[in-house]
Amino acid sequence: MDKEREKQVYLARLAEQAERYDEMVEAMKTVAKMDVELTVEERNLVSVGYKNVIGARRASWRILSSIEQKEESKGHDQNVKRIKTYQQRVEDELTKYALTLSVIDEHVVPSSTSGESTVFYYKMKGDYYRYLAEFKSGDDRKEAADQSLKAYEAATATASADLAPTHPIRLGLALNFSVFYYEILNSPERACHLAKQAFDEAIAELDSLSEESYKDSTLIMQLLRDNFTLWTSDLEEGGEHSKGDERQGEN
């Protein structure tokens, strides 16, 4: 392995252990720009870094949004204004990180030779544009949703051709794509169809499931089934959140 690449991967590992995820992302972006095919470990370092920097800010945004609603109900207009300003800072950070995902299109995907890696990266891109669509509005929301849809569709095309229905990455993709249809495109019927199809196809090939991915695959299958049940029984009320990637573990 090239010495600079080895150094950056080591720094990313250090940053992960020190929980300095912003620096972890920067180190792995440097590796990605070398236009080399990433190893499974490197791929996971990219994913963990982004998941943490974006996940933390996403959680912050939701907390601020909840506080804003409470202050609004009490008529505390000045506090609402302060919260909105603070929330905008978090949104700007989220946007900045999601947009650095261009490194996936420009460097990582072109260097990938396996279907598994291609699905992994497009799924990741779809996830993060979905996160942007959660808090954007107007044309910005539409743009984020369009980018997310394209990435999920590209991932699905490759997954259908190259990965078994029981593969945890293919199942994780179906889980998150169905959540996208339900929560971003407000299309519960499409979400239900996608979740049920992925679950049924995996069940049909359960006997061929490898021992190493059994736990991950069956967990995601359970989440697919839970969402399908939730969405079909609660379409009228629509008050519950879907079980998406936060609970599916690494895949």
UniProtKB/Swiss-Prot annotation:
One of the GO BP terms on file: signal transduction
GO cellular component: cytoplasm
Tissue: Most abundant in roots and flowers.
Signal peptide range: none
Membrane spanning stretches: none
Family to which this protein belongs: Belongs to the 14-3-3 family.
This protein's name: 14-3-3-like protein
Gene source species: Nicotiana tabacum (Common tobacco)
Lineage: Eukaryota, Viridiplantae, Streptophyta, Embryophyta, Tracheophyta
